[in-house]
Amino acid sequence: MLPIDIVYFSNYSGNTKRFVEKIDYGNISINIPIDRGSGSSLTVNSPYVLFVPTYGGGEGRAAIPRQVRSFLNVKENRALLRGVVGFGNTNFGEHFCKAADLISAKTGVPVIAKVEIFGTQQDVDKVKERLTLLYGQEL
């Protein structure tokens, strides 16, 4: 188990949630609720990595789901963010995983990985490896 939690946002498709479950992480995994505005009522109290999909084809600020923006607007949540894993569709070209890029640029944390839609086993292994390199022990 690593000294870092996972916070994720997964819409109705459930792609991000399924990916987080495949990691079989052992730490706390917190889901930002889909209900609009509910992200601002959720606070974390330990360091975490954010797993986030890209919305709207990656165009501008709308690339970051509203619930995730609300969550990150809470100062304490932003302070504990240590990295971001992005999910997207390569059909959107330069906007692939744009939400992760925008969050990284705004907060100064690294983009740990970019995952196509719901990811492959290779993506799961890559994310596990990178989390281990960044935060310690084997997953």
Descriptions of predicted regions:
Residues M1-P65:
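N-terminal beta1-alpha1-beta2 submodule of the flavodoxin-like/Rossmannoid cofactor-binding fold
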Residues V44-L139:
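FMN-binding flavodoxin-like domain, especially the glycine-rich phosphate-binding loop
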